[in-house]
Amino acid sequence: VSRICIIPRADNTGGVSSFQAKMAAGLAVRGIQVCHDLDETPYDAVLLTSTTRQLLGLLRQRRRGLRIVQRLDGINWLHRHLPTGPRHFLRAEYGNRLLALLRSRVVTHIVYQSEFVRGWWGAQFGPERVPSVVIHNGVDLSAYSPDGPHVRSITVSRLLVVEGNLQGGYETGVATAIGLAELLAGQFPLELMIVGRVSSRLQTESQKLSRVPMVWGGLVLPDQIPPLDRSAHVLYSADLNAACPNSAIEAMACGLPVVGFATGALPELVTCDAGRLVPYGGDPWKLEKPDLPALAGATAGILQDNARFRESARHRAEEAFSLDLMVGRYLDVLLG
């Protein structure tokens, strides 16, 4: 029986935790075991999903002939443009440097989450010295499906934002979502629902400034996301320069079309009529003011032809983002 060591174990919310859970489930279906400790030998390969200080342990396993596969996310960057505080700044820079060290000196193979991520790492830290491949994130298409419980209004359109964390510099996504909702509210009966970790101060301030009805969902468990996606009419993908946003993939799997700016990996993911992407209108890396009217126009088009976009979104997910496809491609890298 094959066994994969996935480290470090993620115990938080967000992308890494979601990926590890999906990967473990997909491996279990194939009869492959998982552990989360380098000392729990034997195993057949190591999958590194974020930073770790266990460099000596990884090098020891590499000398034994095991593949050490690094799954690379994007590079921390918002802290360089926003006042997130010295502690956050140092932690973000340390994380970047440690990942770069692992990439250049320790691992035997690299999986980039998107072509965008591959180019980003290459531009900032130079070309990799080991074999690499791009594997987009996947999702369980039976759990994340248009079929299932939902409460989707036929009179009020719901604009949905789903992010694990909308703090630490990511508050800009909330401001943009509110601005988008304000522009749409003149054309459509509309409510804005924001799911993710948001400070109570930001909630209060936003509610005062906006005339659009707002629903704050807070942090939710993964199994609560499909009903939320099914109950909305369009997802605004709020993360600028995102590496491979799970929320967009999960939305499409549930038949929820995606709207956003054409930054990061979104142009690789949201194709055909699975949604609409528009040029940012300024420099997203400098957090310049975005082109909200263009975004509102694209969103209006989705709301006016929602059924067609919903069908196309699901088709795109079935075509490219199945969990089985993702796990199979990772196993090709891990086990050869």
Residue ranges of model-derived segments:
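A charged, aromatic-enriched C-terminal amphipathic alpha-helix characteristic of glycosyltransferases
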Residues: 149, 290, 294, 304-334
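A short, active-site helix/loop in glycosyltransferases that binds the activated sugar's phosphate group
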Residues: 100-131, 139-143
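Acidic anion/phosphate-binding donor-loop and adjacent secondary structure
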Residues: 122-123, 138-155, 204, 227
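Conserved donor-binding/catalytic core segment of Leloir-type glycosyltransferases
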Residues: 150-182
